[in-house]
């Protein structure tokens, strides 16, 4: 049997250091909210492969659907020989993505591809080249999505300048002194100083920032952004790669914002652990790209498509949207109880089950505590709980449990978090 230490040594020789690894363990098998490493140790998984496992590890209905598809067809490339699961999934997404208008859907493989294609479609539809993204944003690791991403280190450090015609607005974050008025004013400054509105093809926004710290836009801000886009003929792109697929208590977070985007990207949990992503948008906008301008060899792979179709059925059969809201409330209640004993927890927040806590030195919001955050992650792992951090200051703990988690596992995870804070304080 290989140990984690031995595998980590082999990893350093075989895999470039640019591929980070948060936890120095190697997973061997998993079930719902539990993971076992190669040494047989069991962990509670509160990371979900970075928001990919809303239906848990290896949901039996998803596994059964995938096994059945594997016996029929694994790949043809949809642009060469089409297959029904791709078409069926697109038809369903056209109905489920927010917006009371005709829609079409493109399937790809990764969230980065989805965002990049959304911008490409917006540029084709508007005949413009500029894009506005936000501070703290994370949109992917391809060259263009790195330009959209509002954090240089570690994502694009040492790579030189990214593609141009990307402009940075402020994401509203009252906790850190950025009001909604500040955010809107920053867009108007772009229009005045950097790029005229008639040169902007799209504004790309995460309704709840993922890597940026789980800060959620308010419906009021999103409505102001929608009005601004309408005024200037700009496409509004909602990046729901992390917030979508039911994480926030609705299938898409934009359903809670009171307005619809022109284009929506999705990925991560949509296929229960299989690589699938997509863009859904206004039909006439999606048709702006000429034949041959969209697609990819593996885009919308049939195995991933049937997995996604089954995931959507599981959401309905197991009432997972309501469970996301119930689960989120249980997590927030438990974390708020911990925060009462630990003033270093300066904020507990989240939509649905997309929950985060933010840590500060002595509760001072001007002193983000990245060191304590990293310590809590490490202590939790030692106690059998997998957590992730995020945020521009590396001081946010995010919780991305499966929506299928058992109540006893929630209590166990919260107890471990509480113990970690108690011990770190000693």
UniProtKB/Swiss-Prot annotation:
Binding site for pyridoxal 5'-phosphate: 111-112, 242, 297
Null allele phenotype: Cells lacking this gene are not able to utilize GABA as a nitrogen source, in contrast to wild-type, but grow normally with arginine, ornithine, putrescine and agmatine. Cells show only 68% of the wild-type GABA aminotransferase activity.
One Pfam match: Aminotran_3
Positions of post-translational N6-(pyridoxal phosphate)lysine modification: 268
The reaction(s) this protein catalyses: 4-aminobutanoate + 2-oxoglutarate = succinate semialdehyde + L-glutamate; 5-aminopentanoate + 2-oxoglutarate = 5-oxopentanoate + L-glutamate
SUPFAM superfamilies: PLP-dependent transferases (SSF53383)
GO cellular component: cytosol
The keyword Transferase belongs to this UniProt entry's keyword annotation: yes
EC number of this enzyme: 2.6.1.19, 2.6.1.48
Gene3D superfamilies: Aspartate Aminotransferase, domain 1, Type I PLP-dependent aspartate aminotransferase-like (Major domain)
The protein's required cofactors: pyridoxal 5'-phosphate
Gene Ontology terms for molecular function: 4-aminobutyrate:2-oxoglutarate transaminase activity; 5-aminovalerate transaminase activity; N2-acetyl-L-ornithine:2-oxoglutarate 5-aminotransferase activity; protein homodimerization activity; pyridoxal phosphate binding
InterPro entries per record: 4NH2But_aminotransferase_bac, Aminotrans_3, Aminotrans_3_PPA_site, Class-III_PLP-dep_AT, PyrdxlP-dep_Trfase, PyrdxlP-dep_Trfase_major, PyrdxlP-dep_Trfase_small
Domain of life: Bacteria
One GO BP annotation of this record: arginine biosynthetic process via ornithine
Effect the entry attributes to changing residue 211 to S: 100-fold decrease in catalytic activity and 15-fold decrease in affinity for GABA
Factors inducing expression: Induced by RpoS in response to multiple stress conditions, including shifts to acidic pH or high osmolarity as well as starvation or stationary phase. Catabolite repression by glucose (repression relieved by GABA). Makes part of the gabDTPC operon, which is up-regulated by nitrogen limitation.
Job description of the protein: Pyridoxal phosphate-dependent enzyme that catalyzes transamination between primary amines and alpha-keto acids. Catalyzes the transfer of the amino group from gamma-aminobutyrate (GABA) to alpha-ketoglutarate (KG) to yield succinic semialdehyde (SSA) and glutamate. Thereby functions in a GABA degradation pathway that allows some E.coli strains to utilize GABA as a nitrogen source for growth. Also catalyzes the conversion of 5-aminovalerate to glutarate semialdehyde, as part of a L-lysine degradation pathway that proceeds via cadaverine, glutarate and L-2-hydroxyglutarate.
The name this protein goes by in its record: 4-aminobutyrate aminotransferase GabT
């Amino acid at each position: 049997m290989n140990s984690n230490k031995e595998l980590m040594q082999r990893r350093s020789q075989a895999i470039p250091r640019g591929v980070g690894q948060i936890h120095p363990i190697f997973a061997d098998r998993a079930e719902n909210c539990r993971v076992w490493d190669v040494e047989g140790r069991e962990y509670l998984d509160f990371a979900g492969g970075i928001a990919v496992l809303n239906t848990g590890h290896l949901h039996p209905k998803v596994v059964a659907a995938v096994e059945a598809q594997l016996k029929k067809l694994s790949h043809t490339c949809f642009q060469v020989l089409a297959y029904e699961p791709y078409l069926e999934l697109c038809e369903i997404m056209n109905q489920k993505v927010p917006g009371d208008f005709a829609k079409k859907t493109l399937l790809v493989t990764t969230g980065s591809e989805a965002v990049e294609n959304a911008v490409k479609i917006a540029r084709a539809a508007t005949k413009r080249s500029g894009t506005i993204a936000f501070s703290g944003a994370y949109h992917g690791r391809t060259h263009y999505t790195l330009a959209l991403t509002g954090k240089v280190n570690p994502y694009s450090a040492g790579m030189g300048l990214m593609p141009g015609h990307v402009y940075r607005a402020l994401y509203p974050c009252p906790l850190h002194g950025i009001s909604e008025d500040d955010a809107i004013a920053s867009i108007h400054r772009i229009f005045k100083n950097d790029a005229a509105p008639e040169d902007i093809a799209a504004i790309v926004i995460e309704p709840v920032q993922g890597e940026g710290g789980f800060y959620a836009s308010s419906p009021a801000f999103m409505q102001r952004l929608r009005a601004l886009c309408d005024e200037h003929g700009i496409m509004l792109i909602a990046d729901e790669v992390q917030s979508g697929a039911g994480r926030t208590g609705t299938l898409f977070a934009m359903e809670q914002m009171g307005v619809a985007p022109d284009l929506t990207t999705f990925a991560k949990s949509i296929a229960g652990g299989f690589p699938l992503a997509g863009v859904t948008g206004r039909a006439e906008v999606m048709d702006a790209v000429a034949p041959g301008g969209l697609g990819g060899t593996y885009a919308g792979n049939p195995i991933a498509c049937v997995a996604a179709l089954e995931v959507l059925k599981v959401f309905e059969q197991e009432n997972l949207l309501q469970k996301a809201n119930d689960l989120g409330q249980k997590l927030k209640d438990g974390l708020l109880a911990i925060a009462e004993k630990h003033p270093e927890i300066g904020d507990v927040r989240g939509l649905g089950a997309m929950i985060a806590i933010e840590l500060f030195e002595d509760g001072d919001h001007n002193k983000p505590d990245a060191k304590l955050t990293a310590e809590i992650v490490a202590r939790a792992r030692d106690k059998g709980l997998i957590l992730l951090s995020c945020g521009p200051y590396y001081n946010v703990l995010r919780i991305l449990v499966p929506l299928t988690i058992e109540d006893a596992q929630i209590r166990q995870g919260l107890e471990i978090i509480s113990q970690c804070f108690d011990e770190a304080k000693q």
